[in-house]
Swiss-Prot record:
The lineage of its organism: Bacteria, Pseudomonadati, Pseudomonadota, Gammaproteobacteria, Pseudomonadales. It is a multi-pass membrane protein. This is Chloramphenicol-sensitive protein RarD. Keywords: Cell membrane, Membrane, Transmembrane, Transmembrane helix, Transport. The gene is rarD. It is found in: Cell membrane. Its main location: membrane. GO terms for cellular component: plasma membrane. Belongs to the EamA transporter family.
């Protein structure tokens, strides 16, 4: 599978959009994490339909809708992928509010290693020498963190191991990123509405924080753009490269946690993150080199 410049840019854009959320959710107080997740689902639906209109994807969405009912196995798979995504959304919203953004970032540091393993074992993808060095650097950093803490956070574990089956299943389903996101949101909508009803009247929260009327729709817009970009990149890139580029997100998460959310970073942890930052630089260099080769060959 060739390297797509568009896929690389989409992956980077998704990472930047996603890492705005840990700080963003603090602006949504006094809503709690469950309320924020439910609102994220509800407000993502109109925003993703606006995205469909803006990108003129109605024919694609209509074709995917027809295929959904023509192939019953797809109809059975979407509730499963929706549940997988809801789990990750819940952790991503809850962790910053619980002061666990650094643990979340460690999970995202582990995720690309899992994705590279998936690419190698299930798709027969080979790593370039620089990619192999990048993975080794990242693995060294992760192992140092385990040695340092003598513990394994469940937040990190669920984040690292939850996404690979999701990406594999979505790739197997062969539904475009935007249509798949629409279907998953529609499957989650009844659950989100039920959660908001069960959690009770929110009028007091909106009176205390009128900004919620603007911030909640914006949450849906950020979610729609970020997830659409991520899924599009996952289909345009080889699984291994897609996994390695995912290191950009935890680096940014780390910076948000330390610089903006005030989470503690001990000097000895530098030996965890320095090899991982080196892995990111090597990956970017290797991706640029491969893209230049393709351009010279006219691919």
């Amino acid at each position: 599978m060739r390297i797509s410049g568009q896929g690389v840019l989409l992956s980077l854009a998704a990472s930047v959009l996603f890492v705005t959320l840990p700080g963003y959710v603090h602006l949504l107080e006094p809503l709690d994490s469950l309320q924020v997740v439910a609102h994220r689902v509800v407000w993502s639906i109109p925003m993703v339909f606006l995205l469909v209109v803006a990108t003129r994807q109605w024919p694609t969405l209509r074709a995917a809708w027809c295929r959904l009912f023509a192939e019953p196995w797809l109809l059975a798979c979407f509730p499963l992928t929706a549940a997988m995504m809801l789990l990750q959304w819940g952790i991503f919203i809850w962790a910053p509010l619980a002061g666990k953004t650094l643990e979340l970032s460690l999970g995202y540091f582990l995720l690309p290693l899992a994705m590279v393993l998936v690419g190698r074992v299930f798709y027969g993808e080979r790593l370039t020498p620089l990619q192999a060095i990048a993975v080794a650097c990242a693995l060294a950093g992760v192992l140092h963190e385990f040695w340092l803490t003598r513990a394994f956070s469940w937040v990190s574990l669920v984040t690292a191991l939850g996404y690979p089956p999701y990406f594999m299943l979505r790739r197997r389903m062969g539904v475009d990123a935007l249509s798949g996101f629409v279907f998953e949101m529609l499957f989650l909508l009844p659950l989100a509405l039920a959660a908001l009803y069960w959690l009770g009247d929110e009028s007091q929260a909106f009176r205390e924080a009128p900004r919620l009327w603007l911030l909640l729709p914006m949450l849906g817009l950020i979610s729609a753009l970020a997830f659409g970009a991520m899924m599009a990149s996952s289909r345009l890139l080889p699984m291994g490269l897609f996994g390695i580029l995912s290191y950009v997100e935890p680096v940014l998460l780390f910076l948000v946690a330390v610089l903006f959310l005030g989470e503690a970073f001990r000097p000895e942890q530098l030996w965890t993150y320095a090899p991982i930052w080196l892995a990111v630089l090597l990956t970017g260099w290797d991706s640029a080199r491969l893209l230049r080769k393709q351009a010279r060959r006219g691919i």
